[in-house]
C-alpha cells in the first residue's frame, strides 16, 4: 500500500510539473520576444531565442515605458488597486463580522444576497453598468473604486464570514465586559484575528483589480485615464501599427509586481482560503 501511494505521488508530481511548465511557457515566450529587435520575429522565429543579430537588450523596455506613458498608467493602476482593496478589506471584514454575530433573518438574507452576487456573470450587467457610470459621472479612478467594492464584496464577505464562524464569541464578550464599544471590539480584538484571511483576500483582490481590463475600459474616460492593461492594449506605433516587442516588454513589467506580491505572501492564500471555507 505505501508503494502504491508513493507511485501515485510521483505520477501526480509529474503531472503537476507538466501543468506548471505549460502555465509558465507563455510568460517565457513573451519574455524572450521582448528582448528581440522590433520586426525581427515572425511566426517562424517567435519560438526561437534571440540571437546576436536580433537581441535588443532593454531598449524595448525603455521605449515601451516612455512611449505609452507608463508612469501615469502605473499611478492610475496603483491608486485604483490600493483604494479598491482597502475599501474591500475594511467594509467586507466589518460586514462579515456583523453577519456572523447578528443571527437573524435579515442577516441571513443579506449573506445569501452577497454570496449570490458571486455567481452573476459580469457580462449580464456590464452595458447597464457602463451607462449608469457615465450618467453618474463615475468615470474617474476614484469613483471606479466604489464599483470594484461592489463586485469584490461577494468573495471577501464569504471568506470573512467563514473565518469569523471559527472565532469564539467569548473573546468579544470579555472585551465588552471591559467596557469596549462595538467599534473598539472590532478594531482592537477582531481585526488582528482576521490577519490570515485579510492578507489572502488582499492578494486575491489585488491580482483581480490590477489585471482587470474590461471594467476600466467600460467605465473610465479612455482619453484621460488609462490603467496599465488599457495602456498596453492601446499601444500603437506610427500609422496605427502594433509594435509587438515593446508591447511584450510592457506586459512583463506589468506582471512583475503581482509575481513579487504572490511569491512573498503565497502561504497566506492557502491559510486564508482554508480558514474561510473549510472552518466555515
What are these regions (language model features)?
Residues 2-280:
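A structural signal for multi-pass alpha-helical bundles of membrane permease subunits
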Amino acid at each position: 500500500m505505501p508503494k502504491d501511494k508513493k507511485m501515485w505521488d510521483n505520477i501526480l508530481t509529474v503531472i503537476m510539473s507538466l501543468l506548471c511548465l505549460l502555465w509558465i511557457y507563455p510568460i517565457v515566450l513573451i519574455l524572450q520576444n521582448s528582448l528581440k529587435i522590433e520586426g525581427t520575429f515572425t511566426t517562424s522565429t517567435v519560438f526561437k531565442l534571440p540571437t546576436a543579430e536580433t537581441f535588443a537588450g532593454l531598449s524595448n523596455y525603455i521605449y515601451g515605458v516612455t512611449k505609452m506613458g507608463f508612469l501615469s498608467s502605473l499611478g492610475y493602476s496603483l491608486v485604483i488597486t490600493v483604494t479598491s482593496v482597502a475599501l474591500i478589506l475594511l467594509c467586507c471584514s466589518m460586514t462579515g463580522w456583523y453577519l456572523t454575530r447578528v443571527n437573524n433573518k435579515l442577516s441571513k438574507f443579506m449573506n445569501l444576497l452577497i454570496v449570490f452576487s458571486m455567481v452573476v456573470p459580469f457580462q449580464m450587467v456590464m452595458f447597464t453598468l457602463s451607462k449608469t457610470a457615465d450618467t453618474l459621472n463615475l468615470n474617474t479612478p476614484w469613483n471606479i473604486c466604489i464599483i470594484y467594492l461592489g463586485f469584490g464584496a461577494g468573495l471577501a464577505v464569504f471568506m470573512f464570514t467563514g473565518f469569523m464562524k471559527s472565532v469564539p464569541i467569548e473573546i468579544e464578550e470579555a472585551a465588552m465586559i471591559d467596557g469596549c464599544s462595538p467599534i473598539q471590539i472590532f478594531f482592537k480584538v477582531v481585526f488582528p484575528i482576521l490577519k490570515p484571511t485579510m492578507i489572502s483576500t488582499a492578494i486575491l483582490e489585488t491580482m483581480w483589480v490590477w489585471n482587470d481590463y474590461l471594467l476600466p475600459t467600460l467605465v473610465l474616460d479612455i482619453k484621460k485615464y488609462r490603467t496599465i492593461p488599457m495602456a498596453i492594449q492601446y499601444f500603437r506605433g506610427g500609422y496605427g501599427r502594433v509594435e509587438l516587442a515593446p508591447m511584450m516588454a510592457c506586459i512583463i513589467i506589468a506582471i512583475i509586481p503581482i509575481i513579487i506580491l504572490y511569491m512573498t505572501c503565497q502561504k497566506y492564500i492557502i491559510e486564508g482560503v482554508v480558514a474561510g471555507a473549510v472552518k466555515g
